[in-house]
């Protein structure tokens, strides 16, 4: 988004890189940023409270998959948006509702069956459930299904980013 506004998107468009390489690089930059922030957060919280990680492998897997999916969502939003208000629209009407309906603040077992089914279609549910399982050892859903679901969503979201960037959606005149 910022590259579109300040005109530096041209540097990416004229770089001797394929669309796949550019999108993969930007996605991995999002993952790197997320991992660094996560590590710093865990270290700071560890100094304040006693944090026990029950499953390191699950934590790593869900961190990488969640940050990759969210990075791709950010790329899609950045390609679609023409101004910062459009980015706020994505945050306010897509990200925040999915987050609040993900079972972060409550167990989805307390919801009626229909809302449980809706929650289990929400990718944020599996992201948060994976982190919950990593730290406290309990989950509301299937961790293995969550890994498969987020892996598939990673491929799909990356492919959508790839197609939009390759087409030049809202970046090439």
Identify the role of each PLM range.
Residues 9-12, 44, 77, 81, ...:
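Hydrophobic alpha-helical interface/terminus motif in multipass membrane transporters
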Residues 8-9, 27, 39, 72, ...:
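Hydrophobic alpha-helical segments typical of transmembrane helices
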Residues 1-17, 171:
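Transmembrane helix boundary and interhelical loop/hinge segments in multi-pass membrane proteins
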Residues 19-91, 138-162:
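Alpha-helical transmembrane segments and their short interhelical loops
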Residues 49, 99-156:
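Membrane-interfacial helix-loop-helix junctions in multi-pass membrane proteins
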Residues 165-173:
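Short cytosolic juxtamembrane segments of multi-pass membrane proteins
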């Amino acid at each position: 988004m910022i590259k579109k506004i300040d005109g530096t998107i041209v540097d990416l468009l004229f770089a001797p890189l394929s669309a796949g390489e550019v999108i993969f690089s930007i996605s991995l930059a999002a993952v790197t940023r997320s991992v660094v922030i996560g590590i710093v957060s865990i270290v700071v919280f560890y100094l304040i409270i006693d944090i026990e990680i029950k499953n390191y492998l699950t934590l790593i897997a869900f961190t990488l998959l969640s940050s990759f999916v969210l990075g791709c969502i950010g790329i899609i939003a950045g390609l679609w948006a023409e101004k910062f208000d459009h980015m706020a629209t994505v945050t306010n009407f897509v990200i925040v509702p999915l987050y609040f309906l993900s079972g972060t603040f409550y167990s989805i077992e307390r919801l009626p069956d229909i809302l449980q089914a809706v929650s289990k279609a929400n990718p944020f549910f599996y992201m948060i459930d994976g982190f919950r399982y990593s730290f406290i050892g309990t989950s509301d859903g299937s961790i293995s299904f969550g890994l498969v679901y987020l892996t598939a969503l990673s491929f799909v979201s990356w492919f959508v980013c790839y197609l939009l960037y390759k087409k030049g959606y809202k970046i090439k005149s």
